[in-house]
Amino acid sequence: YMDVISLHQAGFTNTVAPLGTAFTPNQAMLLKRYTNEVILSFDSDGAGIKAALRALPILRQNGLRGRVLSMKPYKDPDELIKAEGAESYQKRIDEAESGRMFELLVLYGQYNQQDPESRTEFLHEVAKKLAQIEEPLERQIYLTSAANRFMIRKNDLENLVNRYGLGYQYEQVNEQYKTAPETEERRKEKKKNTKNQPQ
């Protein structure tokens, strides 16, 4: 409660909290009635980072843009506002990372960037994340940003993304095929395959 109270007292009245529970799709649907963008302001510790990582896909699935506010070196909004005031908090809102870039930066911190093998693994994970962005223009924008931020040639990263993208598209099509209603043609094909199996 204290974070929300502090933010409202500081003038940030469009602030809500999940009250200690995990952020849910129902909460995202409720937020969608009032806005298209949500700035996550969870605690800066490991639990807060995990909460943000869990919330971001839920926001996307419900048509909301998610950004993540950096609280460091403070633990939470209440502590930040008491130490630096409302202007500092507003500045951090303006500079909040996009959800996808936040996910990549969390990944960055999980790998030793000085070790060639570890850095290679990291870049492969970045490519996997980027390959999952369905909108081509959005994917290109993040590809350029990631290449600049993580100091890799854009062409090299793009080749990796394209490689993983083909696999991701295949998985999607395969999953859609599995879950699609069974047609007469599919029933015949399945029956034919069953007959051809060795006894």
Name these PLM-found stretches.
Residues 1-3:
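Short, polar loop motifs at secondary-structure junctions
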Residues 22-38, 42-199:
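A charged alpha-helical hairpin associated with nucleic-acid processing machineries
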Residues 13-20, 158:
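Short hydrophobic/aromatic-enriched beta-strand-loop microsegments
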Residues 5-13, 34:
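Alpha-helix C-terminal capping segments
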